[in-house]
Amino acid sequence: MLLVLIDVDGFMGQLYNENGTQTILIPREAVIFYWEKNTAFNILQLFFHGGIDTIFEKTNQRSFSFQSRHIHHFTLDESPLPNSITLPTDTLQAFKACKKIIFQHLVKITKDHEQILLLHKGGPEGEWVRSFNIPNATVQNLNDLCCPSVEKLVLKKKDYISSSIGCPKHIQGSNHCPIFECHVLFKWIQENTFIAQGVLERSSLSYEEAVLFIEHRINMVDNHPFKKDSIKQNQKKKNWIATQFVQHGIYVDNGILTKIYNKYSLF
């Protein structure tokens, strides 16, 4: 089985045209991280340049500035690397072109494999790879396994992965380089998951352990919906319980989660 982890970084914004409003991502970097069980990984790294026309830039100026400073550390006017792929000047055409390029590379990487698992962690990548309909491929979101954020994984274990791993596009040691993120997520996958019936699985917390955790959170957190004893609060309570597990990177399967809801009469 071939496992493929995809991460794409770039400028995300609103595109307005005759079809209405569309949220699109114009990549600056894409990483395809792939391996088979018990084998070394391979990395395909793609750099992109251009593709952001004047109208798209002006419409999303404030958002792009925030993304540059706080998310990926790309700049709109940076010089392209020698191996960068130049995108069309029209933003919509650039969006279609970069998706096509990533699709073609995925097809090339996966074409000789009978079973493929395409992995992503949130973001637009999931929508992209699902739309590609790669033969013999299943798409899975790591967030569905309560995979912690890269920042949390790195903070939890300072030596989790070397901060020197990255590329020239980012500030040295930045946690937002796709190369760095894929290394961190690959290590988390290796340490916390197993393959069952063609997808990644995680061992669930037991019902007893899950209840103890929720009771602990109720006692520790000041602002929670259990302070109000009202049926109207039931959905908020269910959302709060699920969020506690996700925020702490704890995986609980749906059967146990349902039992916990029943314990608190959250029907």
From Swiss-Prot:
An annotated GO BP: symbiont-mediated suppression of host cytoplasmic pattern recognition receptor signaling pathway via inhibition of RIG-I activity
Domain of life, source organism: Viruses
Keywords: Early protein, Host-virus interaction, Inhibition of host innate immune response by virus, Inhibition of host RIG-I by virus, Inhibition of host RLR pathway by virus, Viral immunoevasion
Induction per the UniProt record: Expressed in the early phase of the viral replicative cycle.
Similarity-based family: Belongs to the asfivirus I267L family.
UniProt protein name: Protein I267L
Organism expressing this protein natively: African swine fever virus (isolate Tick/Malawi/Lil 20-1/1983) (ASFV)
